[in-house]
Amino acid sequence: MESVQLKKEELVERAARSVRPAVHLEMAYDVLDELSRSPEKYPEQLAKLSRIVVKVLNDVEDELEHNPQNEELQKARNRLAAWGGYVAELAKRLEEADDRERIRMVRLFCAMALAPDKLTVELKKLLKGR
């Protein structure tokens, strides 16, 4: 079963990792704050995050046209593009979870999505420096 389906914690971690560059580039901290405060609003907040991911993915694609060999841009594109699969599975798991587990998963997701990483820092330099 584990080979077919990710563990909850692993899914939350991967979803957060996928959305992290978009959150930081667009300073979408308010979306994560609202999600953490009101976990029951996860469908609306995940939809907002999806729109932000699309915007940042388009920015990354535009920059890749000028710099197609840049590894950070390629990694960022792959990470952002994976969001669709992760958010679908995350929404399904949140729907299936009881209230207590849903709150735990949502807050863990928010904490992980807020934590910066090396790729996000590098991507910020690349895209904000143009």
UniProtKB/Swiss-Prot annotation:
GO terms for biological process?
defense response to virus
Listed name of the protein = CRISPR system associated protein Csa5
Describe its function.
Answer: CRISPR (clustered regularly interspaced short palindromic repeat) is an adaptive immune system that provides protection against mobile genetic elements (viruses, transposable elements and conjugative plasmids). CRISPR clusters contain spacers, sequences complementary to antecedent mobile elements, and target invading nucleic acids. CRISPR clusters are transcribed and processed into CRISPR RNA (crRNA).
Q: Which UniProt keywords apply?
A: Antiviral defense
Which proteins does it associate with, and in what oligomeric form? Can form a Cascade complex with Cas7, Cas5a, Cas3, Cas3' and Cas8a2.
Q: What induces it?
A: Repressed by 5 J/m2 ultraviolet light and 50 mM NaCl, slightly induced by 20 J/m2 ultraviolet light, 100 and 150 mM Nacl. Member of the csa5-cas7-cas5a-cas3-cas3'-cas8a2 operon.
